[in-house]
UniProtKB/Swiss-Prot annotation:
It comes from Caenorhabditis elegans. It is a multi-pass membrane protein. The keyword Transmembrane applies. Keywords: Membrane, Transmembrane, Transmembrane helix. GO terms for cellular component: membrane. This is Serpentine receptor class gamma-4. InterPro entries: 7TM_GPCR_serpentine_rcpt_Srg (IPR000609), Nematode_SR-like (IPR051119). GO terms for molecular function: transmembrane signaling receptor activity.
Amino acid sequence: MSQCNSSYSVTRENLKYFAQFVYLVPGVLFQLRILIVIWGTHNKIYLKSSFFTIWSLDSLVSLVQMFLDVSFTRIHIYFPQLCEGFSVFLEIHWMIPNIVYPFYLYAFTAKSVIHSFLSINRASCVLMPTKYAYIWRSHMKKVIVFILLYPFLLLWNVIISEKYLDFIFGGFVISYIKRVPWASLSKFQIISYVFTFSVTLVTNSITLSKMAKLKKRLLMAERHLCVATAWISSGFVISLIAQAHFAFFRGDHELVEIFYIIQCVSFDLLNVGSPIVMITLSRELRNHVFLINPSPVVSRSTSTFNNKNNISILIQ
């Protein structure tokens, strides 16, 4: 039996979706373009860099999550007129939520471990400049495998548990009934986010401290690193707040709706904001993505990734 809330204004809820559509669709196309550059047209440049190899995985999971948001997840939240029919459809075709929901969570869960490795990567660049490339090249396959498998350590209970429709706003979200009561995804996420946040702060503090001691201080690189750190950290802190509510204080339905919004803000901040920050701060990537003077940039980029004295990996 449908539990759709008909008290919500169809027009207002639809406008909420289209307001997000305005930046999510360009975000999807933007991430797709970045992946084409890194994995396709300029793969000989970027895949030589352990940093961009790892960061491209972040672009991939962001692309997946934003695509699902704009084509599925936020449609059944912000289109009250579709709620009844869509909810019945998903209850009949139960395999759809059983596949889409874990897949969506997989994408965002992977981001925390990816950003941990990115922070460690940047720190090792300045701490071990002569060994940096060799160490990461030697262990890159292991790092990628770990990143791909890590989300399952958090999501296994979601995968095996029964899914149901949780009606919020004028629509609904997909949730799950824990088959293993103690294995809460929100609690797992809190641990993961706290770890990522801690690693980001510690490694970037070490990186900035080391850079400040260089004979020729790279003030612009230091400033860029601070901006990137602040942006990424704010995204995980906001998500941490939402997960803390879901893990320990979930009860008041109105508050649940507020924290769903907070969670979406954190998703969008990381998924849409991260590539914008990188494009803004990395001249080489910006030139390749927007086809600005590509020829001269190729030679500079190649030397960038092989010159131990160049700190461009920290964001130029």
